[in-house]
Regions:
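Membrane-proximal periplasmic segments of bacterial cell-envelope enzymes
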Residues: 1-272, 276-298, 310, 321-379, ...
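Flexible helix-coil linker/hinge segments at domain or subdomain boundaries
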Residues: 707-715
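Loop/helix-junction capping segments adjacent to catalytic residues or to phosphate/diphosphate-binding pockets
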Residues: 85-86, 314, 691-692
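Conserved helix-loop functional segments at active or binding sites
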Residues: 322-329, 396-399, 628, 707
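Short proline/glycine- and acidic-rich turn/helix-capping motifs at secondary-structure junctions
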Residues: 222-227, 715-723
Length: 723
């Protein structure tokens, strides 16, 4: 028994001895024989941890058509520690020039943030407050006199960055510009310096082949647009400035994150922005990737559905441009001129034969007057009557979102400010389009009834003794309207009728009803808007420089005085008229869904902002009067709608008086169908002369809307028959 145990012990000892010998041999081979080889290999491998940029969410229209998505791209960034090592082992300045030369050879532009001209004589350029603060921080840190000239600053940079005297002034400026950008980012502790955004793949290949130290290729995304329309709605994304970084850093954004700058990209940033991931990459000395391990998976942003119908949006922009160009051509202006800072706008915006209009317009201006002023801008908005949802928001002139960033400086100085969103930020006196509000206020307060008749004598004489006797528009032709009730007064747009109603109401009650209609109030849209102003006693002095008098009340009653509203406000006001006083929020968000569309994050809920309460017969009287504007031969929109058969239309034209030497703005509102309203439209043409000149825009929009609806109804019917 003892012998067996002894044998087993010997065997186990022998096994352990053999294993120990094998291990020692392997260790000897690893450390002594091949140690140097493995050491060199490990030194030549590099492990880096980098951010994986999460894709931004898509933007879709109300029917799920993708308007904005993402395209993979590559940015060139500067790695400060590699390009500018503390031991001066790299000729940083020579590398910078080589890099810029490569970039230019491949037709790319690099981002130069030094606010000094690129060629002598060197001078400071115009910069934003943010860039000015960066420059001041740089000068303070590097002990440069804050009053130093551009030449003096560049001279100090040549010394600081050891830029050889053999380099030309232009070459030194290139080096200084890039080193300044890197240095500034260190000072403000933000992102890496992105030298080139969306770099060409050929350039990327050359950079990688040359294994250029200090230059990183970073995978990113750029926005891809499936439409050239809706620029003012969609907005754009870009790198953060200092103020934005302070705001978004608290939310966990990386310093090099791209964020929404305007439009829905900005408004719905919290839904669209994704959460970045991290990846650990092991690379060989030649740049070959050996392994890639995601330590945190990126989470793409959510997808946002808008209330906009992109097909109707396109039709609205085309209709607006077509009518504007027709009027411009009629007045002798060159419609081929590039007003937009963008040469790729559409040929379809050509000039048609203008719709004939009456020689006299009941909204305030003689069409036969000589027009000396050029149309400077226009806006149109289409909303759903029953929900308040914006279906189309158009501003002229516009631009192509996909080329906006590269054309930005050109757009900033382009004729008529194409970046300005007139539909939401332009404010205009409503003119006679305000008269339905005055009518409802008078009917509700019982200063008039639907049967009240007021005689138009051409001149309102109640305050003639005080030297104030405003006239009706028709009196310029030595005519009067005779005796009108409220329906006929709306058809005729009789100033005398509405002067009388306004005088009996007083400005305070008139203001109350206007605000209930949303005029001078926020609409609830998430994109930046102006709220305008409804004429009132409190701020009249601020607007006019005089105290409020009764004449101001009379002018307010016909849409003049201090009243200024946006096209969106006018469209929602018109929708509230069509909806018997119910005003809904103009929120442009339909819903947001997760990146894979599986989960609903948020959904639009109908919100009633205010209600104008009055009897149905009062609404009927106003609706009928607005309908007659389109269908009665005396109506100011009759020339546009007399042969329109797609639906019944209720409308009102208006003229915003601009002053003695400036052609009036044209204003137009409408809703359709009259019997069961679906959409409301507002159109404004700056210096359009009269509201009747805007009516063709609305007709074109209505034709498109009911054509789309008819096609949709046919499809649904065919689908139900197949079931």
């Amino acid at each position: 028994m003892n012998t067996i145990k002894k044998d087993r012990l010997i065997i186990l000892t022998a096994v352990f001895a053999i294993l120990l010998v094998v291990y020692l041999v392997f260790l000897y081979k690893l450390q002594i024989i091949e140690g140097e080889s493995y050491y060199k290999e490990s030194r030549n491998q590099q492990v880096t941890t980098s951010t994986v940029v999460a894709a931004r969410g898509n933007i879709l229209d109300r029917y799920g058509r993708v308007i904005v998505s993402n395209k993979s791209s590559y940015d060139l960034t500067i790695n400060e520690s590699e390009l500018f090592p503390s031991d001066d082992s790299v000729d940083s300045n020579a590398t910078i020039l080589k890099l810029v030369k490569l970039i230019r050879e491949y037709g790319e532009d690099y981002i130069d943030e030094l606010p000094i001209t690129t060629e002598p004589p060197f001078e400071y350029t115009e910069i934003s407050d943010t860039d000015k603060a960066r420059l001041q921080a740089y000068m303070k840190t590097n002990k440069v006199d804050e009053n130093a000239t551009a030449v003096e600053l560049l001279s100090s940079m040549r010394t600081r960055y050891k830029i050889d005297s053999n380099y030309s002034a232009e070459e030194a400026r290139i080096i200084a510009g890039i080193r300044y950008a890197v240095n500034v980012r260190y000072l403000i502790n933000t992102s890496d310096y992105v030298l080139v955004q969306d770099a060409d793949m050929k350039l990327i290949s050359i950079i990688r082949e040359n294994n250029m130290l200090g230059v990183n290729v970073k995978e990113s995304f750029i926005r891809g647009y499936n439409t050239t329309y809706a620029a003012h709605i969609l907005g754009y994304v870009g790198l953060m400035n200092d103020a934005e970084y302070e705001k978004y850093a608290e939310l966990g954004y990386s310093g090099d994150a791209k964020v929404g700058k305007s439009g829905v990209e900005y408004a719905f940033e919290k839904y669209l922005h994704g959460t970045n991931g991290t990846v650990q990459v092991t690379s060989a000395a030649d740049g070959t990737i050996i392994s890639k391990t995601y330590t945190t998976e990126p989470k793409p942003g959510n997808n946002v559905y808008l209330t906009i119908d992109i097909a109707l949006q396109e039709a609205t922009e085309r209709a607006l441009a077509t009518t504007v160009n027709a009027l411009r051509a009629e007045r002798g202006y060159d419609i081929t001129e590039d007003l937009l800072g963008d040469d790729d706008k559409k040929d379809e915006e050509a000039t048609p034969t203008p719709t004939p209009t009456p020689s006299q317009t009941p909204d305030g201006q003689d069409d036969e007057e000589k027009i000396d002023d050029e149309i400077t801008g226009a806006g149109a908005v289409v909303v759903d009557v029953k929900t308040g949802e914006p279906l189309a928001i158009a501003s002229w002139p516009t631009y192509n979102t996909s080329t906006m960033l590269e054309n930005y400086s050109k757009l900033l100085t382009a004729k008529y400010s194409p970046l300005f969103n007139r539909a939401l930020q332009g404010t205009y006196a409503p003119g006679s389009t305000f008269k339905p509000c005055t009518a409802i206020a008078g009917l509700t307060e019982k200063t008039i009834s639907t049967s009240t008749r007021i005689k138009c004598t051409g001149v309102y004489t109640k305050y003639a003794a005080q030297g104030y006797a405003p006239q009706c528009w028709i009196y310029a032709s030595h005519l009067t309207h005779g005796s009108d009730n409220v329906t006929e007064a709306l058809r005729d747009s009789c100033n005398i009728f509405f002067y009388t109603v306004g005088n009996n109401l007083g400005i305070d009650k008139l203001e109350k009803y206007a605000r209930q209609f949303g005029l001078g109030e926020s609409t609830g849209i998430e994109i930046y808007e102006e709220t305008g102003n409804m004429s009132n006693r409190a701020n009249h002095y601020e607007y006019a420089g005089t105290e409020w008098v009764v004449g101001d009340t009379l002018q307010a009653a016909i849409g003049q005085a201090d009243s200024i509203f946006t096209p969106l406000q006018l469209a929602e006001y018109c929708a509230a008229i069509a909806n018997n006083g119910q005003r809904h929020s103009a929120s442009i968000l339909k819903e947001a869904r997760s990146y894979d569309y599986s989960e609903k994050i948020v959904q639009r809920t109908e919100e009633v902002l205010s209600t104008v309460k009055t009897e149905d017969y009062n609404w009927n009287a106003v609706h009928k009067g607005m309908e007659l504007v389109a269908k009665h031969p005396d109506g100011s929109a009759y020339a546009t709608f007399y042969n329109y058969g797609a639906s019944t239309v209720a409308c009102k034209t208006g003229t915003a008086q601009k002053g003695e030497n400036i052609t009036n703005d044209g204003i137009f509102i409408c809703f359709a169908p009259v019997e069961d309203p679906e959409i409301a439209i507002a159109v404004v043409i700056e210096r359009g002369q009269s509201g009747s000149r805007c009516a063709p825009v609305a007709r074109s929009i209505l034709e498109t809307y009911f054509s789309i609806k008819s096609a949709s109804d046919v499809t649904e019917t065919e689908g139900s028959l197949l079931k």
